[in-house]
Regions:
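A short glycine-rich beta-strand->turn/loop micro-motif centered on a GG-aromatic cluster
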Residues: 119-123, 144-157
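Histidine-anchored nucleotide/phosphate-binding helix
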Residues: 34-35, 130-139
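Active-site acidic carboxylates
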Residues: 1-93, 146, 161, 165-168
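Short, conserved loop/helix-junction motifs that constitute active-site signature segments
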Residues: 40, 112, 138-140
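Internal catalytic-core helix/loop-beta-alpha segment
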Residues: 73-126
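Conserved small/polar residues in nucleotide/adenosyl-binding loops
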Residues: 177-178
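A glycine-rich helix N-cap at a beta->alpha junction
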Residues: 171-174
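Structured adenosyl-cofactor binding patch, chiefly the S-adenosyl-L-methionine
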Residues: 136, 152-164
Length: 178
């Protein structure tokens, strides 16, 4: 059985764009190393893309978070830095209009054989990472789901810690590097 790495929304707008925050750029190298590790082991890699249209501000999310970001076709929608160079045509890609990906959930449920483990990295820990980790755990309840704390972050350190704590309560393992 293969392992699965899900790179969640490591896009320009979340790193140094309209919703970027200090420290998000520091995840580039650890995430790149993780992708290379999985690729060298011939494991499976998937990417999620937060994907909005020009009418974003008219959506429920846009009314609650009135900051245009990750507009399809705009530079902010693209993967950030070195991560953009590491995606391959054979990787799975899930564009999502909201925090969690229903398509990812369905794909995980249909995966046969199931994955040995599912690991998530990327942004933002307390929004899209937690949403997709919960979906992964729901889709594959017998598969270990892992979030690498060194490869995720939030604009608010307190919310990052709370997200990791909530995930632990849902039996999602948080890797913490000391």
């Amino acid at each position: 059985m293969k392992r699965l790495l899900i790179v969640v929304d490591y896009q320009n707008d979340f790193v140094d764009g309209s919703l970027g925050f200090p420290g998000a750029e520091l995840l580039e190298e650890p995430i790149a190393a993780k992708i290379e590790e999985y690729r060298s082991a011939a494991d499976v890699i998937a990417f999620t893309f937060d994907t909005h249209r020009c009418d974003y501000l008219e959506t429920q999310e846009g009314r609650n978070l009135p900051v245009e970001h990750c507009i399809e076709g705009a530079p902010g929608h693209a993967l950030y830095g070195r991560i953009a160079e590491l995606i391959r045509p054979t990787d799975e890609v899930f564009e999502k209009p909201s925090f969690g990906s229903a398509d990812l959930f369905e794909w995980l449920r249909a995966a046969q054989p199931p994955f040995k483990s599912i690991e998530l990295v990327g942004l933002v820990s307390n929004i899209c990472v937690i949403s997709n980790a919960v979906l992964a755990k729901a889709a594959c309840p017998e598969v270990p789901v892992i979030v690498d704390a060194a490869c995720t972050a939030s604009f608010d350190d307190s919310l990052n810690e709370k997200a990791l704590d909530v995930l632990e309560g849902l039996q999602v393992l948080s890797l913490i590097h000391i």
